Amino acid sequence: MPLLKILQESLKLLYREPKIFVPRLITTALYTAVIIYIAGITSQIAEATGYFQGDAASIDPAVVRALLGDLVIVLVSLLFLLLLDLISYAMYPALIREHSAGRPISLHGSLKEALGAWKILAVLGVMIILFALAGSIFILPFQFIALKTGEVSFYLFAAFIVMVAALVLLILLFFVIPVGVIEKKGVLDAFRHGFALSFRHKKDLFAINLFFLILSTVTFALMVLAETQYQGLAALSSIILFILVRVIQAVIYTYICVVNPYFYIQVR
């Protein structure tokens, strides 16, 4: 089936089966709560370090120490959300398989199948964390140079390199979860078979992952806009925009989750 047809059919599926939105809506709501919490902590840290007064040297150590507990809570929450994100993502292969076979979809049944692939999800979780750490370490010196020189191009160059690396990783891992959940494969077999399929369909996967990477970047930009632009008298506008962007985010991420197993079912 042509790639464009797969994208169109996946979009139609969202319309026919609104229940499919539930897992991503739940994770998006939880992420939103954590992001609001992080925003509050970030504001407190900025005040404690004198950032708003333009005096970053006037740091109150006592206040910063008091915020360390909050930072630990944020870190633990993000790790939990990553786990929840992977589980909800792994529900979609079972949902799409049942729909493609003409059977009614079951959120409970798909959750059980996703949990059954916990070893694969654990390996993917570790890989994501390591990639995030490596990407952050790689970007850090470029960000420091950009702050010192005022040349944003240094930071943009590093961010571009990380995005290219992320695109390659997304292509390689694209079929791993569908293989693990639908075919009931173990960790090694899921990765081996997933990699083989990725190489076989690398052109289509490059196009589809680039498309989704652009969508995700636009969504992230909208999210940042919603969180930073409106204050004071425009507080109501800020809340409306924030909620709207979160709904858009949930829809786009659900679409990504649907296309992934739908594509696999067409090419396996």
Locations of regions flagged by a protein language model:
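Short, small/hydrophobic-residue-rich motifs at membrane-helix boundaries and re-entrant hairpins
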Residues: 4-8, 15, 19-101, 132, ...
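Nonpolar helix-loop interface/hinge motif
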Residues: 1-44, 104-108, 163-235
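Residue-level signature of the transmembrane alpha-helical core
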Residues: 25, 29, 79, 95, ...
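Short, membrane-exposed interhelical loops at transmembrane-helix boundaries
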Residues: 56-64, 230-241
